[in-house]
Amino acid sequence: MGPVMPPSKKPESPGISVSSGLSQCYRGSSFSKALQEDDDLDFSLPDIRLEEGAMEDEELTNLNWLHESKNLLKSFGDSVLRSVSPVQDLDDDTPPSPAHSDMPYDARQNPNCKPPYSFSCLIFMAIEDSPTKRLPVKDIYNWILEHFPYFANAPTGWKNSVRHNLSLNKCFKKVDKERSQSIGKGSLWCIDPEYRQNLIQALKKTPYHSHSNVFNTPPASPQAYQSTSGPPIWPGSTFFKRNGALLQDPDIDAASAMMLLNTPPEIQAGFPPGVIQNGARVLSRGLFPGVRPLPITPIGMTAAVRNGLTSCRMRTESEPSCGSPVVSGDPKEDHNYSSAKSSHARSTSPASDCVSSSSADDHYEFATKGGQEGSEGSFQSHESHSETEEDDRKCSPKEAKDALGDSGYASQHKKRQHFAKARKVPSDTLPLKKRRTEKPPESDDEEMKEAAGSLLHLAGIRSCLNNITNRTAKGQKEQKETTKN
């Protein structure tokens, strides 16, 4: 590297500064002499290299003189350039402002000097200096005037700035005043615990002050700060915060339910009693004696319970009518079709279904025989009766399905299924709270029960009558053949 001009050596003028800096690099050359004689000399580097061909390349790239010649920008005589210059003026003797100095600020020594704190920091110091950590606006004014005499003679606009910071800054929040306090008009202001660390960091960036030493360390425990700054904050209280916002009671229910889903069971045991149970906040009986929590029912449970009796009385088309007993709402109208046989008949084989249907059809056979005793006496013989029993045992589900279709039960069953779906859809679209409070119409359910029972009863009677007529026709035909033989 080439020679460097020492910092102690200062040029007398801008022109001399530039020429002397370049002369140190090119000693004894014609270029240094030309700098002193003619100021209009061309400073092109190709000409310099032609004149000094034997000079080393390192001296050509030496630009240390630019750092030493600090008066280059001042030679233009423009104050704006001096203000935006990146080069620091080491000879400037103007006293620095307190905000940019490392010296501590003292309001007693400089009462007319503006404090280097923002209004949010002033409000923060005023509130933290109070024993209750809460102050009205007028007490904040008095604290600032007491500790910073500058604002006594300052324009009155600083009070508006304090009020604007209180209302617009998220770090401060308004709290309700107690009845025992007599502060007059206005509200109490306190520090939001969530933004307290932000204010402490902002206060640390300002010069040291005797009032800021208490804010450098956070409180010993969050409970100690909450006991002085406001009511306790836990997941079930009305002041519970989520993402920096105060939640009201409806929001607390949803937020606490989501917290319960994301919280391990061992942590859930530490929640206060009555906060979260089954995904909903349970109200305390002592605080609200007339309020009782509603039980949590899954979606669609109310509609399922409402339509449970109707759906259980419906029979699908795949089930044979001869094997499934007719269900009636009244035990007296059961006609020997008990509901206990329904589960047993569906779990057994089709052969057992036919046996049960034959025994059931025998009851109707006896009733019809009593009416036809005078006209057809030949059906009382033991031979014809045994043959009809064997035919009943050979019945198949396909014949039963045909009998069911003849009775018109299939069309009625489809209509009833469509009606049940139409009733189920609006109830499922209702909100959960309305679904809890909504009661199913009992009159409609009773009508549907009676209609379903009567239709099933008529379908069973008609299918049985068809079987009886078929058996009687077969018996007559066989009897005629036997008489002819």
UniProtKB/Swiss-Prot annotation:
Record-level Gene Ontology MF annotations: cis-regulatory region sequence-specific DNA binding; DNA-binding transcription factor activity
Keyword Chloroplast: no
Keyword Transmembrane helix carried by entry: no
Region (Disordered): 1-21, 86-108, 315-454
Biased composition (Low complexity): 338-359
CDD domains listed in its UniProt record: FH_FOXN3
Primary localisation category: nucleus
Any one Gene Ontology BP term: regulation of DNA-templated transcription
Keywords per UniProt: Cell cycle, DNA-binding, Nucleus, Phosphoprotein, Repressor, Transcription, Transcription regulation
A GO CC annotation given for this chain: nucleus
Subunit annotation: Interacts through its C-terminus with the C-terminus of SNW1/SKIP.
Protein name, per record: Forkhead box protein N3
Source organism per UniProt: Sus scrofa
